[in-house]
């Protein structure tokens, strides 16, 4: 007979026998430590370090990805995290290190510079980075998910060819601009506007609490489109690039958490976004 969690009736009986024996021994004045050293106990079926037996469900390739990510994180990130957290110090070379190992944009196809892994592998990478610090995981996951995935899923072929390979290597750093200072992450209340003009859009607005923005080269931002007639249309995504006139990204200092990763604003003061980046 087996219980639903895999524990046999014999193991349960052994546990109960031991429990009642301990109570009897305590009544006789036998020290607790002496009792447990001399009494065999049933082996626990629960594995605290893998409670859902995840490892048994992984493929060999997924285990290899996990182990490679774990080795890098423990060796390279673990050595940096205390200094980074204490002093709000972000090291941009981390992106290039991760890129060299294929840890950025894991699900991006090989033709655009990614390793073409599945989402299980991506989750395993994120978990290993998170073991060290949420700030480092934020750096990696913003680049991999919020920046690279929208470009890969919804961008033009030219946009994919231009942005994804350099984001995958970490040569370029990306950020994702949705949250605003007065409206949080509520898209319906979004105040940022993209005014249609000849050859592109004029971007006006502010984003807040944006991971990676002060060191970013690529800005995936969201705005409500305004037609040339003045009608406010749907929300659209735009890809802005470092150096565009009117684009700035001041840093936010004094955070309580995520101190190992840099956070900032995105300020768009009549930034011209060409049609090919919309």
Q: Which residue stretches match the model-derived regions?
A:
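Amphipathic, small/basic residue-rich leader segments at the start of a protein or domain
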Residues: 19-27, 33-141, 158-162, 166-169
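A glycine-rich, basic-preceded beta-loop-alpha segment at the flavin cofactor/substrate interface
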Residues: 42-44, 121, 242-252, 262-278
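Buried hydrophobic positions in well-ordered alpha/beta secondary-structure cores of metabolic enzymes
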Residues: 62, 73, 102, 109, ...
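N-terminal glycine-rich flavin-associated loop
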Residues: 138-158, 184
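Short Gly/Pro-enriched turn/cap motifs at secondary-structure boundaries
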Residues: 167, 182-185, 209-212, 228-229, ...
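A short, Trp-centered hydrophobic/proline-enriched beta-strand micro-motif
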Residues: 170-178
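A short core secondary-structure module
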Residues: 191, 200, 204-249
